[in-house]
């Protein structure tokens, strides 16, 4: 038993092996430490490079903002949806809506307001229009077609399922606005839809902007949202995705001077056009158009930030003012800063609304550009 408990003496080579093992272990520890230090240094270098790149991008963006290439003012147009009821067939109703969309896009209209001039806002909307609100059928159809045409082609399938109102939308001429881009077209801004794709926490969502690659943005957003993306100037050609950040839909207009389409708003009556303005202080310049107005050539437009031009239907603005329960005015002219006749000496007894939009915006455009640019 004593012999079994006694330590066996080391052989002549075992002590040396033990020393070699310790040296090898110490050497491995030092190598591992060096490797960790090297890895940490590389990580810090990458972080520093990313910070420098972010700082450089911020400086470039700040310099771009200082250039002030944008358009500071907005232009809104309001018209009654009842003009569609004057068309003789579903095809002509659709084509009429397309003419209005084209006219507004040509003159860079930022907002189209479709109002109900016939006082039908109190009626219940039934059938396929349930849930839209208290609006007339023509108003809703006009608004839907206007929205459809404004949407870039590569996003329409996601936002516009098959609908009876859009049955003949294939007949319409495209707007071909700056935000309706081809796949390989280069641009600082693009419209896109947030795709339903899993992302790691703290990393941004992916957006389909109609290009060969998706765009990775700086925020996590709900799938299905339509967003305006500003693409980074430096894009690595070998990356699986492009990179950019989500910006306001107004940025292309205010920072780059690009026309970026229009928004569509439904108003239950003429007074709601003014009362439900999307701007904090409302419209600071309102213009009514009528054959009973003063000559547009003598009109002096004041400085403005948000202009609104209102058109009447077959019976003129008087019909909308009379049918509105919120208005108690003898003449619609008192509702506007300017009440103008944009086509004096007309050779036809009537000017259709789609014609009046083209005529009026062409007549007002020079004054609007000057007065809008003067606003500080």
Swiss-Prot record:
GO terms for cellular component: cytoplasm; kinetochore; mitotic spindle; spindle pole centrosome. InterPro entries: Alpha/beta_knot_MTases, NA-bd_OB-fold, Put_MeTrfase-C9orf114-like, tRNA_m1G_MTases_N. GO terms for molecular function: miRNA binding; RNA binding; rRNA (uridine-N3-)-methyltransferase activity; S-adenosyl-L-methionine binding. It is an enzyme of class 2 (transferase). Residues 15-33 have a biased composition (Basic and acidic residues). Its main location: cytoplasm. Pfam families: Methyltrn_RNA_3. Its EC number is 2.1.1.-. Coiled coil: none annotated. S-adenosyl-L-homocysteine binds at residues 289, 292, 312, 341-342. It is found in: Cytoplasm, Cytoskeleton, Spindle; Chromosome, Centromere, Kinetochore; Cytoplasm, Cytoskeleton, Microtubule organizing center, Centrosome. Keywords: Cell cycle, Cell division, Centromere, Chromosome, Cytoplasm, Cytoskeleton, Kinetochore, Methyltransferase, Mitosis, RNA-binding, rRNA processing, S-adenosyl-L-methionine, Transferase. GO terms for biological process: cell division; maintenance of centrosome location; miRNA processing; post-transcriptional regulation of gene expression; rRNA base methylation. S-adenosyl-L-methionine binds at residues 292, 312, 341-342. It catalyses: uridine in 28S rRNA + S-adenosyl-L-methionine = N(3)-methyluridine in 28S rRNA + S-adenosyl-L-homocysteine + H(+). Residues 1-33, 49-71 are annotated as: Disordered. Interacts with INCA1. S-adenosyl-L-methionine-dependent methyltransferase that specifically methylates the N3 position of a uridine in 28S rRNA. Required for association of the centrosomes with the poles of the bipolar mitotic spindle during metaphase. Also involved in chromosome alignment. May promote centrosome maturation probably by recruiting A-kinase anchor protein AKAP9 to centrosomes in early mitosis. Binds specifically to miRNA MIR145 hairpin, regulates MIR145 expression at a postranscriptional level. Belongs to the class IV-like SAM-binding methyltransferase superfamily. Depletion with RNAi causes a significant accumulation of cells in later prometaphase with misaligned chromosomes. This is 28S rRNA (uridine-N(3))-methyltransferase. It comes from Homo sapiens. The gene is SPOUT1.
